[in-house]
Amino acid sequence: MALFRKKDKYIRITPNNSLKGSVSHNVPEVPDELFAKCPACKHMIYKKDLGLAKICPTCSYNFRISAQERLTLTVDEGSFQELFTSIETKDPLRFPGYQEKLQKAKETTGLHEAVLTGKAMVKGQQIALAIMDSHFIMASMGTVVGEKITRLFELAIEENLPVVIFTASGGARMQEGIMSLMQMAKVSAAVKRHSNAGLFYLTILTDPTTGGVTASFAMGGDIILAEPQSLVGFAGRRVIETTVRENLPDDFQKAEFLQDHGFVDAIVKRTELRDKIAHLVAFHGGGQ
């Protein structure tokens, strides 16, 4: 018997490249916008299961929603009258890339700034309404945001209206420097004048409400509500831990933590906010 012998030749199969196209057509494609991943429980959710309120059916997490979606959930159909749309955002510091960022945010959200302001009816109650949209440069507060909210309070004083604001913000808009920081004082002064007139001011804290907005008008309401698990604070968690050199509780800066410590009056489910707003406005004199 031969010690060495040639290996048997195997049959070689050459791939038929012409079949590649036909194979790919048989592979089903899943649309990118069909599912959403819950940031809280990490489950993949069929978007239609979120409903109009955008609430996770597994853990009840409240997804961040746009100003227009919030408007649809809150006010009486056809009652919203948008105001102060002619105020244009400037670039006082000629900050590099700021104009491009603004333009992109406008195209993405359909808004001309980070807050939607106007008058509306909620179950028959007339209110002055502001809704901040975190999809617009994280709803950072610049000169236009501050001016629109200030004018809303001034209009409310003239027309004897309660003010309802849904807050959401990453803080002051750094691209406008000190001009953005002064909006904190300007809006707070308008809130005080509205209060002096004996009118009702309701704030609803949504995720996230931070920075200069928290330090000014967000916490100035006669009654402060919050959506479940909303992040609410001034400085960031890591900044605080570094400063005080202590580990903070896991639920620190969550709406429930603030309620436990007296900073929030009530946590209200998103689906119940419309009824709650109408009830509180009517109880405090109404807006008819």
Curated annotation (Swiss-Prot):
Pfam families linked to this entry: Carboxyl_trans (PF01039)
Catalyzed chemical reaction(s): N(6)-carboxybiotinyl-L-lysyl-[protein] + acetyl-CoA = N(6)-biotinyl-L-lysyl-[protein] + malonyl-CoA
Cofactor annotation comment: Binds 1 zinc ion per subunit.
E.C. no: 2.1.3.15
Top EC class of this enzyme: transferase
Family: Belongs to the AccD/PCCB family.
Name of the featured protein: Acetyl-coenzyme A carboxylase carboxyl transferase subunit beta
Native source species: Streptococcus pyogenes serotype M28 (strain MGAS6180)
